[in-house]
Amino acid sequence: MFFSRKIRSLLLTPKRRWSLILTLCLIFTGINFSTSNDVQASRIKDIAQLHGVRSNQLIGYGLITGLNGTGDDMKKSAFTLQAIYNMMTRSGITLNPSEMKSIKIKNVAAVMVTASLPPFASSGSKIDIQVSSMGDAKSLAGGTLLMTPLKGVDNRVYAIAQGPLAIGAFSFGGKSAQAQKNHPNAGRIPDGATVEDTVLVDIGADGTLTYQLANADFTTANNMTRAINKKFGKDTAYPLDSGSVTINIPPHFSKRVVQFVANVESIDITADSVARVVVNERTGTVVMGQNVRLSTVAVSHGNLNLIIRESFDVSQPAPLADGETVITPSTEISVTEEEGQLVVLNMKNDVSIGEIANALNAIGATPRDLIAIFQAIKAAGAMHGELIVL
């Protein structure tokens, strides 16, 4: 019996390697395979956020009731039993603490409730909540969350949550089999909490607004400042650093701050960024910015093959002999490496990495081929930009 298995084949085949070399030569001698590199403008509201206008996280501890025997095991979840006792006491029902341990309840589960309080949320408005099991409940399907206060980091109650839970999952089974779809121990309640208290946000109280860039960059901050000053007048805006721009509210907008903010956020500007290539060899993902440039470099790309052959020899004793049949495995390993071709890529002008990617995709180069080439070019100092390997 003979088994042959090819374990791994890395990099390019000879035919694709020659196509790769030819394509790189054409690129670096001036042929443009890319589409238009026109820079797209972005609104200020899409790349920056007004300082102080943000959401706040809320959290609470509550009980889910009405479960079909899939709740917490009271013998293992002491906090669930304690929560039930506290709830019954607040409802005016007197229970003997010593008898609580003998009570068997299977339709109740302890849960953590989280929510995000949006900015400018007013009292009485509704927000979505997320519910997740805290104990050993098998499923929260069909349960109803009892009234649960949601607090902020200052321990103040900002919302009250209650309502039937929607999980979009199920889990059923017995002792020998079980069927489950999605995750039955977490779910959501749309509009499940009512806002009771608000977080005060007074924008422009000191006559200024500060915008924080999502991606700090000196060029983007400068472009944003110039665009605002062009529309509202000189010295209206000035950059604090690479990530912040401060705007002086004009006197005629002092009573119309909301209108001024809307006008500012609708301005189109050109956002800049650091030239960067991000690769993930585990998934074969390559993400690159259009500003990455390459200089003159020599590239050699070879082909490596690793072949492992396994065979089994059978040793059988003679008739009537005192022995047993023995199977002996035999492994043969061979490694072949084809010679890589060295080509000098000499350019008069820098070529973008996007042009190289488009050309390589046209000849069928895989993302892992690009990763190997880009890593080598970066190590040679010919890539002008960051190479990030995840």
Curated annotation (Swiss-Prot):
Molecular function GO terms recorded: structural molecule activity
Origin: domain of life: Bacteria
GO biological process, one term: bacterial-type flagellum-dependent cell motility
Transmembrane segments: none
A cellular-component GO term for this protein: outer membrane-bounded periplasmic space
Signal peptide annotation: 1-36
Function field: Assembles around the rod to form the L-ring and probably protects the motor/basal body from shearing forces during rotation.
Quaternary assembly: The basal body constitutes a major portion of the flagellar organelle and consists of four rings (L,P,S, and M) mounted on a central rod.
The protein's name in its UniProt record: Flagellar P-ring protein
Species assigned in the record: Desulfotalea psychrophila (strain LSv54 / DSM 12343)
Source species taxonomy: Bacteria, Pseudomonadati, Thermodesulfobacteriota, Desulfobulbia, Desulfobulbales
